[in-house]
Structures are given as structure tokens and as C-alpha cells.
Amino acid sequence: MCVALCTVATALWSCDEDETYADQKEKERKAIAGFLSRNLTLLDAQGDTLLSTGKIKVITEQQFLAQDSVTNLDENEYVLFTNTGVYMQIVRKGPGEPIRSGESKRVICRYYEYNILGDSLQTSNQTPYWATNPEVLDVSNNSGSLTASFNTTLNGGGAMYMIYKNISVPNGW
């Protein structure tokens, strides 16, 4: 009987404390809107600026494609990829041709991953420790669908792989 009462009490207490999925999505939307509209500056332990976002101007994928798949840095543009919810600023397009169907290429990148709900830098490979180990991605085009995995054979893996221990590249990368 005592176990049954504890179970019921726990279930009732849990229901009062749990956020619904709709509540979580609303909280996420508000956090994203707040992040996009403020001027954020991330500092390292010595007080040096790591990243300053400025006020972000969001553009659509259609605008992004019309601009030759780059974002305007002077206007602090970020493209929103609606299928993943990822906002990305393309600093440089890079040399070479786009990956054709059936082809694979190696891509090297650096990144900041910011946790807007925790208001903190989550991970980054733009620190002296990771300077010699950028993210190395093996990207393939399978009939127009791009897939990628972190290459760990060249440098043992970059920060993203070492932190999350997964060779799968997050959606939107």
C-alpha cells in the first residue's frame, strides 16, 4: 500500500512539474528570437573576445541561393535552413565545384556551438587546444541528398567528435 501511495504521489507531483511539448517549443521559439535580436559577445577565460554576433539578420534559403549560396557579412546575415532549424553564416564559400551526385569530398570546418537556453558556449574548435584539429567531414552526394560523417582517421577527430563521441554530423552542418 505504501509503495502504491508513493507511486501515485510521485506521478501526481511529476505531472505538475513537467512541461508539455508545446511549452518546450514555445520556450525554444522565445529563446531563439531573443538570441537573434541581441548583440552577444563571447569572451574567453582571459577576457578576449571569441565571438561577437551583433544583431542577426535572418534570410531565407531562397534568398541564400539567389546570393550564390553565401551570406552578407556586412549585414550579419544568417540563413535559416527550415528543414533542420539550423541558422548558419557562410563566411567563405570555398574553392572548387559543388559535389556532384555520386561524388564524395572532404570538408574542413571550424565552428562555435552556442547553447541559447543555457546562455553559454557549448563547444568550439576555435581555441588554441583545437587549432591543429579542425573538424574533418567526409561528405557524399547521393542523388542530391548530402550526408556526412566526421573523419577520425586523419587527426583522431575534432572537438565535436571528441565531445559527443559520434561520427554522425549533426543535421544542418
Q: Could you say what each language-model-derived stretch is?
A:
Residues 15-173:
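Cross-family detector of peptidyl-prolyl cis-trans isomerase
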